[in-house]
Each structure stands twice: as C-alpha cells, then as structure tokens.
C-alpha cells in the first residue's frame, strides 16, 4: 500500500513589498529674485510667492500667481507700513 504525502514548500525569502513613500515634488524656486537697493527694469520679477506674504507698493504689480514685478524701471525698496511688508520701486 502506497502512502501519499502532501508536502508544502514555504518561501525561503519574503517577497519584497511596496512602500507608500518615495515621492517628492520639484522645488518651486520661491522667494526674492532682487534685493533691496538693486536696480530693476520694467517687468522684472522682484518676488515669487504663494499668497501675499509681501504686498505690492508703488510701481509694483501683482501677477495671477501673486508674483510681484516692477511696473517701471527704478530702485527696489522693501519697507514695512501698517504692519505689512511692502516692496516699492522708486525712480533714481
């Protein structure tokens, strides 16, 4: 009479599981592009930001993504008025 044996082989190495980490976004290069006292041409980007961390002052416009840019050529001046940080462009 023949005996039938059921043999089950187990894995000698565990299967490699996936992780939920391992992603990162590209940096957005936010911040000041020109500093206080520098000369800016009309249309030059002064400050890239999300939200209005710094508000536009004289001769400074705000883009759709809250980027501050010079409306005319001149010297950049960062100032604080009424508890708000502002950036302005003044003629020489």
Curated annotation (Swiss-Prot):
Transmembrane regions: none
GO molecular function, one term: structural constituent of ribosome
GO CC term, one of those recorded: cytosolic large ribosomal subunit
Propeptide feature ranges: 1-10
SUPFAM superfamilies, per database record: Ribosomal L27 protein-like
Posttranslational mods: The N-terminus is cleaved by ribosomal processing cysteine protease Prp.
Record-level GO BP terms: translation
Family label: Belongs to the bacterial ribosomal protein bL27 family.
NCBIfam families: L27
Protein name, UniProt field: Large ribosomal subunit protein bL27
Organism this protein belongs to: Aster yellows witches'-broom phytoplasma (strain AYWB)
Gene this chain is encoded by: rpmA
